């Protein structure tokens, strides 16, 4: 639900659009003082165009300028929840981290413990990877040794084969992150991705991803009901057509109430489904208590059987 593209002028490459939208959310949230920011990413702003940076400065001074605040807050919570999951996994002996649809993800560079202990594989479209690698070189002077950049078109290429070619170890304890990814993939691609993970991961491996219900994609009105703000209803209502015009249409959702059955059928167990109420309670307390979240956004993690 990467909701708005502020870029004008020359049309950007399709995969980079979503990547920059999410980097904008992380960068804007990181402008808040400690104790108020839901997530923190010191590198996110380095991936933003001048127009995004200008808007970020305006929105940081005047939060009322933030478009679709519920969606923004849910995306910030997603970053935080996934960060926390990775940190716990490091403490529990993580050996590999695979980030599918990595975009401008910066976990490999900002989460303590990954550089020294964990091999990271960042997988995304070749166009996005090219931009990403250039930015990383600008920030750090060179590409880090602990990260492998794997270029894949998920709809036309075998990501598993490409991953193996880059040194992925089938027997190692691995976490697979699919953040802001699966609703852009056709069902067949999602099934193939999960099948590879289930069959090619070491003991204790896990997946974590976010998803929306099928109804959120298929319906054209009344999507959010009364739980989301009016502006967020409009954001989700128009998101599919907006992203389709930019080359990234929504294609996949999971039937309501069926997430555990969906996951276990594909070779996973110990399913934990996280609702907007759950992450609102976990992260939006004190000064953040009145910040709205979007009720359509769900997170889920599970263990490989």
Model-based region annotation:
Residues 111-114, 158-161, 171-173, 189-193, ...:
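ATP-dependent adenylate-handling active sites, centered on carboxylate activation for C-N bond formation
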């Amino acid at each position: 639900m990467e909701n708005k593209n502020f870029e004008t002028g020359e049309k950007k490459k399709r995969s980079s659009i979503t990547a920059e939208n999410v980097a904008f959310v992380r960068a804007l949230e990181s402008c808040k003082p400690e104790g108020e920011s839901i997530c923190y990413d010191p590198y996110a702003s380095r991936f933003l165009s001048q127009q995004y940076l200008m808007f970020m400065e305006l929105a940081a001074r005047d939060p009322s300028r933030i478009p679709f605040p519920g969606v923004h807050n849910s995306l910030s919570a997603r970053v935080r929840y996934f960060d926390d999951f990775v940190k716990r996994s490091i403490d529990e002996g993580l050996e590999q981290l695979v980030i599918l649809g990595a975009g401008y993800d910066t976990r490999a560079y900002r989460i303590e413990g990954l550089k020294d202990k964990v091999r990271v594989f960042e997988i995304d479209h070749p166009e996005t990877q090219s931009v990403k690698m250039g930015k990383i070189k600008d920030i750090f002077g060179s590409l880090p040794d602990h990260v492998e950049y794997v270029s894949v078109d998920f709809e036309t290429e075998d990501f598993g084969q490409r991953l193996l070619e880059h040194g992925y170890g089938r027997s190692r304890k691995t976490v697979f992150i699919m953040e802001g990814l699966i609703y852009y993939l056709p069902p067949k691609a999602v099934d193939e991705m999960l099948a590879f993970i289930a069959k090619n991961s070491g003991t204790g491996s896990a997946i974590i991803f976010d998803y929306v219900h099928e109804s959120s994609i298929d319906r054209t009105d009344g999507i959010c009901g009364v739980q989301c703000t009016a502006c967020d209803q409009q954001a989700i209502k128009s998101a599919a057509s907006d992203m389709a015009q930019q080359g990234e249409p929504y294609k996949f959702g999971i039937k309501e109430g069926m997430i555990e059955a969906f996951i276990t059928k594909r070779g996973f167990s110990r399913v934990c489904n996280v609702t907007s109420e759950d992450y609102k309670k976990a992260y939006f307390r004190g000064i953040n208590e009145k910040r709205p979240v979007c009720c359509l956004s769900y997170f889920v993690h599970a263990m490989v059987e």
